[in-house]
Structure formats: C-alpha cells, structure tokens
Amino acid sequence: MENMNMNKELIQQQTDKLEYYYNLMLEKLCNMVIASNASEVHEITRSFCEVLSDYKKYTDGKNIFNSYTE
C-alpha cells in the first residue's frame, strides 16, 4: 500500500511539473504569436506539443483543462 501511495505521489509530482511547463510554454507561444516571429513560433509549438503529449501520458489522456474546471 505504501508503494502505491509513493507511485501516486510521484505521478502527481510529474503531472504538476508538466503542467507548469505547459503553462509556461503556452504563455511563450502566445507572446511569440503576438510578436509574429515565425521561426520561434514553430520551435515553441513543437516543444509545446511534446510537453502536452507527456502530460497526457501521466494523466491517462485526461483532458488537460480538467484541472481548471474541477
């Protein structure tokens, strides 16, 4: 049982970390779109999608916006 709690805690830590990076990259992406720097927008969009993919792995595909509505 203790091992299961440790796993849940580790998953929550990873999810929190990924959510932090998700929010950070979303902010950067929005700022770059406003500034219209196409090459930087492409790079941050690629990174953003990678983080989103990792986030979905840790949350079993849960909608990324659920945390804002719960």
UniProtKB/Swiss-Prot annotation:
This is Putative uncharacterized protein DDB_G0285721. It comes from Dictyostelium discoideum (Social amoeba).
